[in-house]
């Protein structure tokens, strides 16, 4: 969608939205049966970090994760091979959604920390075979809508001057729109972390991201009539997805608070060292797997709740009690379990392969795939 410009502002916006909603109904089914499902979070983070490093558009990032989800759902794949699959999904998605000069080059991918640590080296031939295998799996159809394809259209009317902030007219409409866009982008990234969001339609997830952002910003009504008409989603339909997003937000705020307290405690220890050495404390970032923390300073990717400045005090750690979901059938659970973090090593034990899963590529990464003979010609995009 990057090449099509700001389609949501054009005359064909309604038609494009209807087309996306129609394609949404024909998306492949996702069963969540991958034997490597416990590694899914790590590879979704990997795609997000790499796409952020190369400044790829959100639609490319979301499409890459979606392609990875569908591919993992169908095959039993080794851990080393999953790195190749994830990067191939990102390359395909970037070629389909983004500009050509933003597509990562082969040598850039090989220089990534995750590749060097695993002693993996991508070649043009390996990458070509993997991309062809992915394209054949999806029957050469990459026009698969994701929440990122809908979000801008819904954000176009997400904030209006008739909205109220804490029951009062808004003082700075433009800044509120900026915060709305930042929070919607944050919730979109949250939806990438959990495969359970694949149980909802992409347009529903996008609408829920807008609704959750309005709740965080304390805008009322939480779901105005204009958004109901544009998205064709009633509030009651959005509530389950909204609750899941807000729970994730609460967990992020708690993790950020723990990290802040830990830093304060560390600073106090530097000023007033204790008599006996204190045991070291490890901090695990909410959206950064331990495997990637060593490359974090190189990739420069930060995934945390945005902190607004110089406007209304719109963020709070206890939003569930400060502004509950009005008309919500069930309140947000009071006991929130933090989401697990993936500990990825080369010796991870994998679950048994379900009957539906095809154990076709659980081999070493440099295996040549069986593709049709007429795919012998290298395309121009590999001459980088």
Swiss-Prot record:
A Pfam family hit: Cyclin_C
Keyword Coiled coil found: no
Keyword tags: Cyclin
Domain Cyclin N-terminal: 15-143
CDD domains linked to this entry: CYCLIN_CCNJ-like_rpt1, CYCLIN_CCNJ-like_rpt2
Molecular functions (GO terms): cyclin-dependent protein serine/threonine kinase regulator activity
Keyword Transferase: no
Top-rank taxon: Eukaryota
Biological process according to GO: G1/S transition of mitotic cell cycle
Record-level GO cellular component terms: cyclin-dependent protein kinase holoenzyme complex; cytoplasm; microtubule organizing center; nucleus
SMART domains for this protein: CYCLIN, Cyclin_C
InterPro entries per UniProt: Cyclin (IPR039361), Cyclin-like_dom (IPR013763), Cyclin-like_sf (IPR036915), Cyclin_C-dom (IPR004367), Cyclin_N (IPR006671)
SUPFAM superfamilies named in the record: Cyclin-like
Family per record: Belongs to the cyclin family. Cyclin J subfamily.
Name of the featured protein: Cyclin-J
Species, as recorded: Xenopus laevis (African clawed frog)
